[in-house]
Amino acid sequence: KRKSYAPAFAPTFAFRIYLLILALLFHLLAVGAVSLDNGDFGDRYYYRTEFSATEATKRFGVITDMRLDMHVTLFGERASDDGPSGGETVNPFESTTDPAATTAPADTSDTTEATTEPPAPIEYGDNVMDIDFAALAEKETNKDIKAAHEYFGSLTPTKKNAYTGMFKGKNLIFMTLEGFSYKTIDKDRTPILYKMATEGFVFNNYYNSLWGGSTATGEYTTMTGLFHNSAKCLEMSAKDNMYFAMGNQLSRIGYKTYAFHNHYYTYYGRDKSHPNFGYEFIAINHGLEGLTDCWPRSDYEMAVATLPYYINLKQPWHAYYMTVSGHANYSFMGNNMSKRHKDVVENLTCSDNVKAYHACQYEVELMLEELVRQLDEAGELENTVFVMNADHYPYALTDSELAELYGIPEAGIHKNFDLLRNGLILWSASMTEPVVVDKPCSAIDIIPTLSNLFGLEYDSRLFAGVDILSDTMPLVILNQDGDGSAWNWINAYGEYHSATKTFTPYPGFEASDEEIAAYVKPMNGVVQRKN
């Protein structure tokens, strides 16, 4: 006997219109709900003021993310007053210790006569250029550019200091290290890295934000002193005047400037960005030859292949490197460098994937060993400054593996700021003793700090970061993944987590809830305006 079925429902045209109206009403209701949230860096901020693909997807869903992305692509960012408010920041924290202090080498000079009068403080000038922002703002008709002139003109510049020009005229090797963590530095296994990390400038509270969650955004921040949350930021920067990128700054005063990368020339649009940063850019498929064809390629082999470009130059030089050996995957099957150096890490007491991570990062040690050896033989080691920073933490490791590597709890690991701690290496063989810096600082502070150390003419108001060695307190801005928070921040007084909207003062700093709230609101405005 044949079964009978009810006829399929055939929606009428009127019914389809009814569904469409319901969908539109639901969308308007959702948009209205977003508008009710006007907390600092809340849903309203990411819907109306700043577009972030990561935040939009988490907060509003894929379809709304695509719509907002298309709007920004076609028309640019939307101007809005929905961000955190500005106003004067009233600091409620009092301490007898200057939180901006830098621990400098002790003065060992002899004195022949005691004095009752303290020495007069040295008056250093500001790191500024002759830019009249008020005049520029007065003449400007474009409201966005006018607002930018007014903003930069309102900033207090950083001052020159005892370290200004310390490395003037020296060569510079500047590296962005793929997926690097300071946890892989070991006195016995990586002696060159250890020496550089402990005998130069020692930054005890250095952080690497995720920015846009990619190598491109981490590299952009390292190279510019600015930050961006789009993986297309390098390519997009090619149309901008990157006047203060180190390649441009140093080439203007007679340096020969190279940038090297042991991956493809066009990847992330570096073929467009890096020449605009002031470099002759050499990479795979564009001049970089002699490397083993494998994944990932060897950082050590890149050093061997590129040293001849600059080591015998009669003029000062600057070599920038973007490494790739530390790239995921972190396994002995999925990473050629991990497999190559498996014997170096076989005695480590950790899981295989964490061992593989340490093994591939061993390439950085071998690269530095080769650079130091050849520079020493050429008589240029003491005339060369090394600077190294990671693009991001090794986020391809699982949460349990990250907890193992960093020694922090797995639960809530992406809300833990210690996951973003890292090491900034700034070293020269000419330094006779380390300089310890306890201030919180981050990648946006590297270029201003180097500009001051090399005695370059720059305007400190035009960076998102500051010279770490100045008397200005850096503001660490942290973007994390996986917890719905974007612009967290840290300074000498405590840390703010945007997901919970809480500021936690560090020991020794106390204030009432009302004072903290009055402090946090304008500080969030500072963070928003730097973005």
PLM feature spans:
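Solvent-exposed soluble domains appended to multi-pass membrane proteins
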Residues: 141-531
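N-terminal secretory/membrane-targeting segments
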Residues: 1-170, 186-190
